[in-house]
Regions:
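Domain-level signal for soluble alpha/beta catalytic cores
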Residues: 1-355
Length: 355
């Protein structure tokens, strides 16, 4: 009898219950550049012109130990690709088909799973009102078209990543939740001051995102590993949902006219092992990371946990978390706007909010 086929939600719940992590893959753009392929207008073109390259990237990440694959569909939305060779829906469908093929080949070759196919999307590429001219409804419809295509193609979950505008991430999450049954992973990206481009801090992001009811929240991209460590601590301080941590391989540097990331696999693994001990459930990599970084991360974390692991590793159920007094502000109730949050209740007296 074969192994049980988990849904992503079932697998995540099982890992949290048993105090085990979930591993995501690393950079896609990093690997495309490393392949040396040229002659494409956008990375998503390779889904049609060189699907074997994208499939091999997925297989390399599965060999490195990841559970969740990220589709080559980051920029595939109808607004951004209005004048491209294929529709956004076609790019997305092809990206999921490549993932499914890669998973089938990897598991047939004995690469241990489970493995999950994810539709991946980033920002649309235009600012929403009031900072830009794109309306909320236009953003919603754009995300709706491609997430529906992803589900039809067989995606196991949706990853909404590298978001800097909470208004836009709201459009994306609602589009997925209202039009598909896909689990939702939503991650923000932060500047050096630990705020998004539109000014929201971690507490505001957590408050806002959790109200939209995704399955997982967290951050990706950003700056140094030290900044990533502080973001991890802040997310885990306030979040009630599982947290995904996907930092870059450090800050990019220009060497001989080329942009490179100098953090090697062992250093990346060390940083992620610390983030895991803080309580992160889901871990992966972003810009500059490759299968070497992911393999080092997986091996280091599994080695650490084989010698000393307890159920306080998870952060979604509250088990193992230190009880913090309400007056500390962590277990309090918050309301938030676009880029600000306000604690209410507790021993702070009445709060008057003018809008």
């Amino acid at each position: 009898m074969g192994k049980k086929k988990y849904t992503f939600r079932e697998f995540l719940a099982s890992q949290i219950e048993s105090g085990k992590p979930v591993f995501f893959d690393g950079g896609m753009g990093t690997m495309i550049q490393k392949s040396g392929v040229v002659g494409y207008a956008i990375p998503e073109d390779l889904n049609f012109y060189h699907p074997e390259i994208i499939e091999d990237i997925h297989i390399q990440y599965m060999k490195a130990g990841c559970n969740v694959l990220t589709a080559n569909s980051f920029g595939a939305n109808p607004i951004k690709l209005e004048k491209s060779a294929h529709t956004a829906e076609e790019y997305v469908t092809k990206s999921i088909e490549i993932q499914k093929s890669a998973i089938a080949k990897a598991e047939a070759d004995g690469i241990e799973g489970p493995h999950f196919s994810s539709w991946d999307t980033g920002q649309i590429g235009k600012l929403l009102e009031p900072m830009g001219s794109l309306t909320f409804d236009q953003a919603y419809e754009s995300y709706k078209k491609v997430c529906v295509a992803a589900e039809k193609a067989g995606a196991d979950l949706a990853i909404i990543e590298t978001m800097s505008d909470l208004y836009e991430v709201k459009a994306a999450i609602l589009a997925v939740r209202e039009n598909t049954k896909l689990p939702v992973v939503a991650t923000m990206t932060f500047q050096e001051n630990l705020r998004t481009l539109t000014g929201a801090d971690v507490l505001t992001c957590v408050t806002y995102l959790e109200a939209l009811r995704p399955d997982v929240i967290g951050f990706n991209c950003g700056g140094s590993l030290e900044e990533g460590a502080e973001l991890t601590r802040q997310f885990l301080r306030y979040a009630h949902l599982p947290v995904l941590v996907q930092p870059n391989a450090g800050l990019p540097q220009v060497v001989d006219g080329k942009t490179v990331f100098l953090v090697e696999g062992d250093e990346f693994a060390e940083a992620q092992a610390k983030n895991r001990k803080e309580g992160a459930v889901l871990l992966g990599g972003c810009c500059g990371t490759n299968p070497t970084h992911i393999r080092a991360m997986v091996e280091r974390i599994l080695k650490d946990e084989s010698s000393a692991c307890d159920k306080s590793c998870g952060n979604s159920s509250g088990e193992g978390k230190e009880e913090i007094p309400l007056t500390d502000g962590v277990n309090a109730t918050y309301v938030c706007s676009y880029n600000k949050s306000q604690q209410i209740g507790g021993s702070f007296g009445p709060v008057i909010i003018g809008e």
